[in-house]
Each structure stands twice: as structure tokens, then as C-alpha cells.
């Protein structure tokens, strides 16, 4: 695949070619050659179309050439609809003529990677093989199986069949396609180039992306971030989530971060919304194209059934939305409209008033949307079905729908309707005026959640100047300590010892109790390579003799033990994902960290605000805030550790993983008491130059991350 670092590439041959040849054109609707030939001929008013068939004089009433060499001109783009064994010969003929692009429909092309290399060497490009084709509404180009209607959604898909499903679902939902590209095997042109090209595509407002792999994920998500900055957000559908790679992970950090976790973090950093199913993708796409970016997570629920209101509130809360109490002014307004005893504090139950007067639906929605603490309203219940069950009410109900849409526009807020008649005239009228209407409350809530995510501001980035002098990354605990101390992370006072005399020297310089560690062993607890609570020199020497007898010679580390009360053991780690780049992790630590699986992960580096939010979203956050009379611990210092490690992993391509576990977080500081550093041997890794705006120093923040307690100062 061509390196995305060479972007932008000229993809004109695949977006608006001046001439097209379909090799393998056919009259048979069961063959690819038929669909690509009919599609190509639809654009004959814009470009020259050549059909090639070695055994037919005409196809679809159009004259055919027996081969490319017989054409009167060299086509800019050639679509390959021939058996795999014939592809190489057709491509060689095309390259000899000066063809600029090849669309590989055929699967199983012999030596496809070698063929792609020869195509690139000739100055041409290959899309595919195993592609379902492409379509561009702006340039009237269709070289794909299926039917397309023009519209604002671009689809880039690694699976042609799933891409076809999306096209069909979109058509049912009234969404047209601006561009469709089935990337197939990505032997040359990959998703990153195609996504980058969409930034300037006139008709595209929203992008749907299906990918199964992220081989150059940093470049890919960079392109997605630029799309979002251009006002064209992306909905990502992917599969996976396997933890197979965790079986070979050396650190807890590696075993706690799956590919799915990292993809989720990359999506947040790039402003991409990950969806789980094709139907969810189409639902959110319909909502976005109807509403745009005026949604938020603070939701008011309005309904004419207490049961439906309650279900909606539960589904919204489970979906990460907030259902806050309404303000006093809103409650007072509702009190003047609703029957006594009706729920007015969110959810709002109309308690029969809507049935008595349909305009109540619009009036109450206006009341709740006027509340500055509300971003979005969800209307659930019977509205939309009155006219279906009683046609005499149709006109009146449609008028109320108009008022609801006008309220959403005037308040510049989103209204989503859950209706029991999703295919009725009222639902259609609501959609037409920018108010989504769905038949299931979970779909309505999922849409609100997706729209809120797409309405968030894109996280900012800036450059990270790298330090001029970088000490090499070396394995072992002592080297890890020195690396961390060099970037401002405090560690317990310690001495390196290989002999009994050096152990005695350490005991004389440090304050007991002592900790003894075999510094070259990564997971010390499993190997009995760490001993705690050594009260004096005699106990320390005895422990050293016993440990050395079991484990052999090596770099042993004597540390002063952190004995502060009220500490919670946490983990802070960072690693370099092979495809998606550096990430940072924080979570509940200790030897049982994999059991609890309580972590937060983001792409590195992160600003302090993001680090603090990572800590706050942990399941153990209540434990950190103080539990059953215990004082709260210092999460600010914990977040500083997260920032420091995120900057370190981003700046050092020779660093594969770094982990602090446990980090003892007390009321007055966070102190790492063990660390693991794993170097990478890939000298070709690019330095990551991203840094968030609130970073203070040109290298790393040199604030001490040590607790304020005198007990842990050197």
C-alpha cells in the first residue's frame, strides 16, 4: 500500500476520469461486466466509455473492442472484470498504453502485491483487487454492482457486501450516496488516501467507514481527524475485540488494552463515532443529516405514559446520557399546564393532557427546551399515531408536528420522537422538518447519544519539541527509575546493590522499613522477587542472601518502603500500539489489576483535563473520593503522572511500554513503588510530535509527582 505520508495523491482516475474502459463487459445481468458496463454508460455524457470483450462485437448495443490495444485512445481508468488468470496480461497491456488507474474487481489475482508494485512503478494506481467497485455522484461515475441515488453520505468499505448493505439501508431511510468506494485488498490504494480525498469532495457531508484492520492507524485517524475539522464527521463500523494479543503481553498495561480499546481511544481523539451495527450507523446518519451538530447529552424526556417515560429514562442513563432535574422556572411553567400530580421534574408525564389537547405536546416541549440545563428533548409515546387510529385527527396532528419542528428550530436544540407509528404521515413530516422519529426508544436514545458525540468539539493538538539529549531506553527496574526521575517523576529513595557490602551501605543511607527487589525481573510478585517490611539491616541482609541464592547474581534494588496510611494502589501505564501509536492507561492497580479490569485509555499525549477525566470515569472513582470515612486521595497528582507518561511515550519512539504499578495514591501525593520499561528495537518508528495546548514545558513538565509527605522525600 502506498504510504499515506505521501498524501495527497492524485486519485482523479478514480473520481472523475476523462475516459473509462470496462474489460469483460457483458450483456448478462448475472455478471460483473454487465453492472460495470451499464454503470459506465450512464456517465457517457461526461466521459468517453469503451467496452472491451474479446468475443462479442457489441455489448448493451455498444460496439466492443477485443482488447485494450485496439482502442482508439488510452483510457484513463480500466475496470478489470476478467478471470484472475487474465488480469496480469490486461494490466500489462494497459500500462503499455499509459493507463492511469486500474479497478480490480476480480479476487484471487496471482501475485497481486507484485502486480501492484509494477503498476506503481509505471506511474499508475490500483484500487482492489477484490473490490465491489466505486461510485461518485458529483462526476456521474458508477463502476459498481447495485443501484445508487445521489446524496450527502460517502461510504468507504473494506467489505464490499457490507457496503452494499449500507447502500440498501440508506436508500430505505432516504439517504443518498455522494461517493462509494470498496477498497478490497488495498494492494495499492488504501482507506487513508480515499478518506483524505473526501475532505474536498463537494457533496459529502458525512462519512461511513467500515474497516476490519488498521495497519497504518496513526495516518488513518489523522485523515479522519482532518475530515472532522473540515465539518465532515465519520461513523466507524468495525469488528474484533479479541484479546488474543494479550496472551503475549509482557506488562499489565499490554494485557489491559485490547485492539478495541485502542480503536475507541483513537476515535475519541479524532472525533470519530464508533457504531456497532449497520442499522445503528444508518440511524445515526439519518439523525445527523436531519439535525446537524446542535445536540448535547443533557436530555429532557417528555411522554404521555409514565411507563414509557420510565423506560426512556433508564435507556438514556444506560446509554451515557444525563437526565437532569429541570430548573425551577421550567417546573413552574409545567405546573400551570399539567394536571395536579403529574410528574414535572424530568421525565415529564403529560398525564392525559396531550390526549385532551394535542397542542400540549408542542407547548411542553417548548417549556423544557427553554431550560438552559437541557440540550435535547426526547418525546416518547402515542404522538404520531392519533391520526393513524382516527383519521379525523390527522390534519391537527400534522399541525402539531409542524409546531414541534418550529420549536426545535427556534430553540436551536434537538428533538427526537419515539412514536408508535414510525411509518405514518406524522413521522414522515417530522423527519422532513429535521425532527427524527423512530419506532423504538432504544433507537431514539442511541441517535441522541451519537448526535451528542458528533457535536462535541474536536480535541486540540500542538507540536511537542523533543529533547536534544535522550538517554537510551534500557531494561531493568533501576534504569526505569532513572528514566522516570529524569522527566520529573519522583520514586522512593533507593540504592543499587549487587553485594552484601552494598546492601549494608544502602541500609545506612535509607530509613527503614526497607524493600528489596530483584531489579531485572519484570513481574516480581509472581517470582517472589520482592520482599517488603524489612525492619533493619539484619533483616535486609538475610533477605538479600536468601533472594540471591534463589535468583542468582544481578542488580538488586533496596528502597525505602512507602508506609503512608490511607493509600489506594493504582496503575499508570503507556504503550506504543503497533498500528495506532502511543496510548496511556490509568486504572486500579496491584497484583489483581487484570481481575478488576478497571481502566481508562486515551491516545497519547493527553492534557491534564483529559487525564483528570480518565481518573474520574473509573469504576473505582468513589474509592478515590473517600470511602466510609476515609479521606479522599490526591487524584490531581495521579493525573499528573498520567500526563507525564503520555508525554514520555509520545516523545520516545524507542520506548515500547512503560508501567507504574502499583502507584500508591494517598491524601497527599501519588508515589510509584514499582516500574517496568520495555524498549522497542524498531529504529524506523516516527517520533510523535503531538502535544496538547495546556502543556507548559518544551520537554516535559518538571513538577515533582512525589507526595507532599516528608516520609517519601529523598
Predicted segment positions?
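Catalytic-core regions of core metabolic enzymes
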Residues: 1-683, 705, 710-714
Amino acid at each position: 500500500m502506498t504510504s499515506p505520508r505521501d498524501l495527497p495523491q492524485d486519485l482523479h482516475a478514480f473520481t472523475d476520469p476523462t475516459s473509462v474502459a470496462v474489460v469483460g463487459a457483458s450483456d448478462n445481468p448475472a455478471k460483473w461486466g454487465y453492472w460495470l458496463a451499464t454503470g459506465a454508460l450512464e456517465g457517457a455524457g461526461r466521459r468517453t466509455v469503451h467496452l472491451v470483450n474479446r468475443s462479442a462485437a457489441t455489448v448493451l448495443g455498444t460496439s466492443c473492442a477485443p482488447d485494450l490495444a485496439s482502442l482508439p485512445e488510452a483510457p484513463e481508468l480500466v475496470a478489470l472484470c476478467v478471470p484472475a488468470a487474465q488480469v496480469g496480461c490486461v494490466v500489462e497491456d494497459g500500462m503499455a498504453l499509459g493507463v492511469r488507474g486500474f479497478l480490480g474487481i476480480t479476487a484471487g489475482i496471482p501475485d497481486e502485491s507484485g502486480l501492484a508494485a509494477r503498476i506503481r512503478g509505471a506511474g499508475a494506481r490500483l484500487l482492489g483487487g477484490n473490490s465491489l467497485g466505486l461510485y461518485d455522484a458529483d462526476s456521474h461515475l458508477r463502476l459498481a454492482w447495485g443501484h445508487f441515488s445521489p446524496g450527502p453520505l460517502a461510504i468507504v468499505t473494506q467489505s464490499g457486501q457490507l457496503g452494499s448493505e449500507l447502500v440498501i439501508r440508506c436508500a430505505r431511510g432516504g439517504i443518498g450516496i455522494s461517493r462509494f468506494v470498496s477498497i478490497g485488498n488495498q494492494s495499492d490504494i488504501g482507506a487513508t488516501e480515499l478518506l483524505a480525498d473526501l475532505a474536498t469532495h463537494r457533496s459529502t457531508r458525512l462519512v461511513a467507514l467500515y474497516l476490519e484492520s488498521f495497519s497504518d492507524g496513526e495516518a488513518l485517524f489523522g485523515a479522519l481527524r482532518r475530515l472532522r475539522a473540515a465539518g465532515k464527521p465519520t461513523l466507524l463500523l468495525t469488528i474484533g475485540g479479541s484479546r488474543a494479543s494479550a496472551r503475549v503481553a509482557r506488562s499489565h498495561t499490554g494485557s489491559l488494552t485490547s485492539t478495541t480499546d485502542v480503536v475507541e481511544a483513537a476515535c475519541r481523539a479524532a472525533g470519530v463515532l464508533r457504531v456497532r451495527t449497520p442499522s445503528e450507523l444508518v440511524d445515526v446518519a439519518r439523525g445527523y443529516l436531519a439535525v446537524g451538530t446542535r445536540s448535547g447529552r443533557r436530555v429532557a424526556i417528555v411522554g404521555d405514559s409514565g411507563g414509557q417515560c420510565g423506560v426512556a429514562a433508564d435507556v438514556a442513563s444506560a446509554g451515557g446520557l444525563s437526565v437532569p432535574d429541570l430548573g425551577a422556572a421550567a417546573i413552574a411553567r409545567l405546573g400551570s399546564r399539567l394536571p395536579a400530580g403529574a410528574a414535572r421534574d424530568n421525565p415529564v408525564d403529560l398525564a392525559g393532557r396531550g390526549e385532551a389537547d394535542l397542542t400540549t405536546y408542542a407547548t411542553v416541549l417548548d417549556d423544557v427546551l427553554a431550560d438552559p440545563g437541557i440540550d435535547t428533548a426526547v418525546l416518547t409515546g402515542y404522538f404520531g399515531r392519533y391520526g393513524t387510529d382516527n383519521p379525523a385527527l390527522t390534519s391537527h396532528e400534522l399541525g402539531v408536528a409542524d409546531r414541534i419542528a418550529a420549536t426545535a428550530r427556534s430553540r436551536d436544540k434537538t428533538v427526537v420522537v419515539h412514536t408508535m407509528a414510525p411509518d405514518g404521515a406524522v413521522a414522515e413530516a417530522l423527519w422532513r422538518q429535521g425532527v427524527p422519529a423512530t419506532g423504538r426508544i432504544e433507537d431514539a436514545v442511541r441517535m441522541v447519544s451519537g448526535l451528542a458525540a458528533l457535536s462535541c468539539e474536536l480535541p486540540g493538538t500542538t507540536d511537542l519539541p523533543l529533547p536534544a539529549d535522550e538517554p537510551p531506553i534500557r531494561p531493568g527496574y533501576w534504569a526505569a527509575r532513572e528514566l522516570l526521575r529524569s522527566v520529573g517523576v519522583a520514586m522512593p529513595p533507593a540504592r543499587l546493590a549487587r553485594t552484601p557490602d552494598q546492601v549494608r551501605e544502602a541500609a545506612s543511607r535509607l530509613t527503614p522499613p526497607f524493600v528489596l527487589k530483584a531489579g531485572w525481573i519484570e513481574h516480581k510478585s509472581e517470582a517472589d522477587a520482592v520482599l517488603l517490611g524489612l525492619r533493619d539491616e539484619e533483616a535486609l541482609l538475610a533477605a538479600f542472601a536468601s533472594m540471591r541464592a534463589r535468583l542468582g547474581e544481578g542488580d538488586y534494588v533496596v528502597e525505602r518502603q512507602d508506609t503512608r496510611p490511607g493509600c489506594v494502589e493504582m496503575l499508570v501505564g503507556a504503550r506504543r500500539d503497533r498500528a495506532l501509536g502511543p496510548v496511556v492507561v490509568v486504572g486500579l492497580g496491584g497484583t489483581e489489576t487484570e481481575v478488576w479490569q478497571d481502566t481508562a485509555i486515551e491516545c497519547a499525549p493527553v492534557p491534564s483535563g483529559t487525564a483528570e477525566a480518565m481518573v474520574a470515569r473509573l469504576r473505582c472513582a468513589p474509592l478515590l473520593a473517600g470511602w466510609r470515612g476515609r479521606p479522599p486521595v490526591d487524584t490531581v497528582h495521579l493525573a499528573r503522572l498520567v500526563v507525564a507518561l503520555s508525554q514520555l511515550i509520545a516523545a520516545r519512539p524507542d520506548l515500547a511500554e512503560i508501567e507504574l504499578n502499583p502507584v500508591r495514591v494517598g491524601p497527599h501525593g501519588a508515589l510509584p513503588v514499582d516500574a517496568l520499561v520495555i524498549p522497542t528495537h524498531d529504529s524506523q518508528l516516527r517520533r510523535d510530535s503531538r502535544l496538547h495546548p495546556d502543556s507548559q514545558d518544551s520537554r516535559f513538565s518538571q513538577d515533582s509527582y512525589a507526595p507532599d509527605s516528608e516520609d517519601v522525600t529523598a
